[in-house]
Amino acid sequence: MYLKLANSPYSYFLESVQGGEKWGRYSFIGLTAETVIKVYDYEVKVEKNGVLVEQHVVEDPLEWIENYQNQFNVPKLDDLPDFNGGLVGYFGYEIIRYIEPRLANINKTDELNVADILLMVSNDLLVVDNLSSKVHIITHINPDESTYEDALSKLNLIEDNIKKSFQHVPSPKAGIQTDDFVSSFGKNNFMKTVEDIQRYIIAGDVMQAVSYTHLRAHET
């Protein structure tokens, strides 16, 4: 169903598995989001359908996101799980700079040019109830901008797309092997970093730390 309806950028597929469960009751399929929030350092960008509509330099991106989220008010419905849309995405490790003042001015090398935070505003989604074998089609609208008829038309369109036949065409396999990947840090440097972190923990300088390396490969 995901491949049929949402196999595109700024969509998602989530399961509601909790704890040690092997099977989750709900599956969530987020259809393509029109609005996307991206944060680079202290710059917040809001895109709508790929077009930049807002751009701000802020002191605290986390506070800005919280204020943005607070403008939405969604009623709780008994037949739906607690999650039925909203902000979906990721917060990168680099956001520690927003929380720990001592790290605020550290200059980092951005080799990948990816957002520190990326959040989709998920208005349209499917909730699959694996227990009752039902699919809930959800769309959120702003009553000041949209009408009930507009939302109903969108729901009917999604339902029609669900009923359409779909033939999956497998993607060609990438010609990349494990040995093709090259570390930007190197094994020896990585091992030395792990040993340094162990000493810092024993000395009480840090409680935990995360070391990582970028792996690169050229697709053939």
Roles of regions detected by a PLM:
Residues 1-216:
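Extended alpha-helical targeting/anchoring segments
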